[in-house]
């Protein structure tokens, strides 16, 4: 265990070096909002085909105790659009476990796991299908009138919305992406 302090770029660059040396599987963690500082090193691990794992915490659309300066708004789009980076934003413990296993097996590209600090409901319907990038979590009713797409901590919220809509006889399909 290496304590890097407040040095996100150095942390990610050192993990690249550990990966390049071989024999170890490096992973590191920081708040998702601070991923701006480690982005150049993540890009290099993608270019060098290094399987470093980046755990990015405190992901949420909600304002937490640290205030709006700690809301990762544009960061998900940044990593999703970076070539050769596997980006995971799991909605519960099962999807997190599948993402972690996939990241451990993926030794050719960096993996980023965006994890929330919020308490999440474990949904019975979640599955390894999340590794495809998106899947139908549940159909609420038979002939759905709309599709609701959500990812990460917002899937639980979308699930509750679908239940409420079904009470109003509006059938929906929920996709976890």
Task: Go through each PLM region and give its residues.
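Glycine-/acidic-rich phosphate or pyrophosphate-binding loops and their flanking alpha/beta elements
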Residues: 73-76, 81-84, 94-168, 173-175
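Thiamine diphosphate
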Residues: 1-114, 119
